[in-house]
C-alpha cells in the first residue's frame, strides 16, 4: 500500500470516504480488513436498525441521513465514493410471485431513482475513486444502463472470496 501513498493516491492521514446506502457500514469493515486507514467516513443510510449497528461498531462514522436531502458537492474531491443501492427492486432470485411481478427490469422506477442518487453523488462529489456494487441478477437492460451511466464495464465477483456467502456481485 505504500506505493499508493508515494504516488499521492492515498493520503498518509487516511481516506475520506463517502458511503451511500451504507447499511451496517460493511464498506468500512472491508476497508479496515484491507488495511486502509480511514480518516473520515460519511454514511448515508435511513434504516434505523442498520444505523444503530453502525454506530455501535464505529462511533466515529458521520451518520448523514437520506441521500435525497443532500448536496454532495460539499464532498468535492473526496477520496472514495462507495455504495450499492438497495437491490430488492432488481433482484431475481428467491422472489415470491408477488415480488417477481413488481421486479423492475427497465431503468425506471424506485430502484432506478435510488441508483441515480448514486450517480448524482458521483458527479457532485467528484471522487478520486468510486465503487458501485449490486447483485448479479439484475436485468440486462438495467445493467447496460448502469454501465452507460458509470462509464465502466462491471466486474463479476463472488462474495465467497471475502465472506461466508456465495453471492455473485457486480
Predicted stretch roles:
Residues 1-170:
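Conserved active-site and SAM-binding loop architecture
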